[in-house]
């Protein structure tokens, strides 16, 4: 049998499907998720239910978002899950997660995410951070390193800044390729993201922060002065006590927020 087939389902490359099969890893992830009935439990990409089954076993209801129609049909007829699941068939990248929030109940979101959509999905989920208690995701190890990176490192970038603006980021465990069917070509890791109830460095307009960080990191080898010359002047960098000759990966989240807020203030006055 092909190593792309697991439980009778052939992994689809276009959906980035790699199914988690290692029981020890599954148990550790479920322990980190800590399922309960006090939150709206949401799984993205349940696949063949490796996490779905143990999470659902201890709670009354689990909401899942799955793109693959064949997998949705399997879940609808699953002997132990079908009565516990609220199934949404569709693309998580376009899904309105706010609709899942119930009165006085925030979401706990988790999943073994398709690696080909993990970065855009992170940005999409950050839009709903105020409704989320925490998130646990299996990702490429490289993406987890980017999420948790410090300024001055190669992994530090736009994703780092936006993730750490919205959330505390904590790597949980590393997972080798042999824990999956089919084995991915890269190492994986689980990360815990806890959205801030109160932002340590509040930005007046998050869209401006996103635009500024995207602009800054578009050319990593260039200086801030070069990359942000259409947004901030040398005098404004001096006002913020930021060295404009530094490269974008040398600037902290707090400094990016300060630059965005100054730019917003300038636009408001003009």
Curated annotation (Swiss-Prot):
Entry annotated with the keyword RNA-binding: yes
Reaction equations catalysed: adenosine(1518)/adenosine(1519) in 16S rRNA + 4 S-adenosyl-L-methionine = N(6)-dimethyladenosine(1518)/N(6)-dimethyladenosine(1519) in 16S rRNA + 4 S-adenosyl-L-homocysteine + 4 H(+)
InterPro entries in the cross-refs: KsgA/Erm (IPR001737), rRNA_Ade_diMease-like_C (IPR023165), rRNA_Ade_Mease_Trfase_CS (IPR020596), rRNA_Ade_methylase_Trfase_N (IPR020598), rRNA_adenine_dimethylase (IPR011530), SAM-dependent_MTases_sf (IPR029063)
Subcellular location: Cytoplasm
GO MF annotation terms: 16S rRNA (adenine(1518)-N(6)/adenine(1519)-N(6))-dimethyltransferase activity; RNA binding
Keyword Cytoplasm: yes
One GO term describing the cellular component: cytosol
SMART domains: rADc (SM00650)
Enzyme class: transferase
Pfam families, sorted: RrnaAD (PF00398)
Documented EC number(s): 2.1.1.182
Name recorded for this polypeptide: Ribosomal RNA small subunit methyltransferase A
Main location: cytoplasm
Residues binding S-adenosyl-L-methionine, per UniProt: 18, 20, 45, 66, 91, 112
Keywords in alphabetical order: Cytoplasm, Methyltransferase, RNA-binding, rRNA processing, S-adenosyl-L-methionine, Transferase
Family to which the UniProt record says this protein belongs: Belongs to the class I-like SAM-binding methyltransferase superfamily. rRNA adenine N(6)-methyltransferase family. RsmA subfamily.
Job description of the protein: Specifically dimethylates two adjacent adenosines (A1518 and A1519) in the loop of a conserved hairpin near the 3'-end of 16S rRNA in the 30S particle. May play a critical role in biogenesis of 30S subunits.
């Amino acid at each position: 049998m092909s190593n792309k087939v697991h439980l009778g389902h052939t992994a689809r490359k276009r959906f980035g499907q790699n199914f988690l099969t290692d029981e020890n890893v599954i148990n550790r992830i479920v322990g980190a998720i800590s399922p309960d009935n006090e939150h709206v439990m949401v799984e993205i990409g349940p696949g063949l239910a490796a996490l779905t089954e143990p999470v659902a076993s201890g709670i009354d209801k689990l909401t899942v978002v799955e793109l693959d129609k064949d997998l949705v049909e399997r879940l609808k007829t699953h002997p132990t899950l079908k009565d516990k699941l609220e199934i949404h068939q569709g693309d998580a990248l376009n899904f309105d997660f706010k609709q899942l929030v119930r009165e006085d109940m925030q979401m706990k979101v988790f999943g073994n995410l398709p690696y080909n959509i993990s970065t855009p999905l992170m940005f999409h989920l950050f839009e709903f951070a105020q409704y989320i208690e925490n998130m646990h995701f299996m990702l490429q190890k490289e993406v987890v390193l980017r999420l948790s990176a410090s300024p001055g490192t190669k992994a530090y970038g736009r994703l780092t800044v936006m993730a750490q603006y919205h959330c505390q980021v904590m790597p949980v465990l590393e997972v080798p390729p042999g824990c999956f069917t089919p084995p991915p070509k890269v190492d994986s890791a689980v990360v815990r993201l806890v959205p801030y109830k109160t932002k340590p460095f509040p930005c007046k307009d998050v869209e401006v922060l996103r635009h500024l960080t995207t602009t800054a990191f578009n050319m990593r080898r260039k200086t801030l002065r070069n990359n942000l010359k259409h947004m901030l002047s040398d005098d404004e960098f001096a006002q913020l006590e930021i060295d404009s000759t530094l490269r974008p990966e040398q600037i902290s989240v707090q400094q990016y927020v300060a630059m965005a807020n100054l730019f917003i203030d300038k636009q408001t006055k003009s």
